[in-house]
Amino acid sequence: LILCISFTFLNSQVEEGNTVRLQFIKVEEDKVEEFESYMIEYVGPAAKAAVSEGKMENWLLRRVAKNSRYNAGFSHIAIWVATNPEPSWTQVWEKAYPNLSADARSWIYGKGEELYSTVYNANCEYIAGFLRDPSTIPNIAIFNLIKSKKYNAYIEQEKDAKDIFEKHAKGIEGWHVMKRKGMVVNSEGAWDMVTIDLFDTWEKANQNWWSEIPRNVMKKHNEKHGSDLREIRHRVMTGLLFD
């Protein structure tokens, strides 16, 4: 079973240069149900308050498919889009739960720490992307964690690919590319780029969607940018549970 929890706020826009934090989370198998219920029932209202108060643009939580966890070490990915320093999280939780005491809010906030651990965080800078229908969240999202071989050349290749994918690759409902920030990207073992492929069905996700692109278009694109610019380290599959 491949599922995803997703709290999304469709009036928000991700723009070039926005910071998106990917929080890779590990939840033990016997705690998954409790963890996901906690996130929906308690963190969900706080996330909505954070968006309405301008704390961030968007927040999503996805469950990773079991067959994508091999060598990954995480079971969920939380996605924090364009988080701002103000208002404080204390103020956000007060807005979400105005009728609860500070102690009660603190208990709710701390409960999550008993249910999961953060494997690592990756701050990324949004480069480019599209959604065919901004009012609909595609059911399937595949995260490709990539190590670039020629960093700047690969970024330019993906930026140019965005319009090609949007025009010709009708099998995808959306696509995004981001670059990872921080010194960790200099490590040989670390990924430094991520692309996200979005689909409305698993049938489409399991097809070679790029085969829809005319050969002459891809040939011209490859001649301009070259090939063998990246290595996909992990291909992380997720699907939609709650929206």
Q: Where in this protein do the model-derived segments appear?
A:
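Bacterial Sec-dependent N-terminal signal peptides
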Residues: 1-16
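Short S/T/G/P-rich N-terminal loop/turn motif that feeds into the first structured element of a domain
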Residues: 12-243
